[in-house]
């Protein structure tokens, strides 16, 4: 089973999640639930109180959409997430004691407060939504491999189309390598 946890403005049909899903399907994760949630709040970046409100709203929406999923019927579970979706995925797995693999695309620092045990992460050094140094430190502390892209932003893009495609290709190769290895 694969569950996609998007960001607020980065839906499952955008490149990273679109191709991440295709790579996961290629690796045998054929049952897929793509979450969809919305939040109308403003001024989220750098505003802890607003981010917490957003998290609570989105988490509640995710919980409702996943209500009734019988996780125990699956031998392997994969959570693929982006941005605030990484926090929601980690929190959900923790609350419901779901043993799963995690793919974190541009995680937020709060993601790591849920003591993730199995995963891989990707972040851009010019990501304005993440405390990049804190994310890198937390990822390494929890032994989650993290791949860092020098000039990339929160969409893992640089503004240079060919370079963006190279980054996307590299991210998907690393995603595929992670999924093609036996679970720890």
Residues of each region from the PLM?
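Conserved loop-alpha-helix segment in the C-terminal half of the alpha/beta-hydrolase fold
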Residues: 131-144
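Short beta-strand/loop motif that positions the catalytic acidic residue
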Residues: 121-123, 127
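Catalytic histidine-centered segment of alpha/beta-hydrolase-like enzymes
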Residues: 45-46, 152-167
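Gly/Ala-rich beta-loop-alpha elbow adjacent to hydrolase catalytic centers
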Residues: 77-90
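Conserved alpha/beta-hydrolase "acid-adjacent" motif
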Residues: 13, 113, 128-134
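Catalytic active-site module of serine/aspartate enzymes centered on a nucleophile-bearing elbow/loop
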Residues: 59-66, 160-184
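A conserved short beta-strand
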Residues: 97-109, 117-118
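Serine-hydrolase catalytic machinery in alpha/beta-hydrolase-like enzymes
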Residues: 1-73
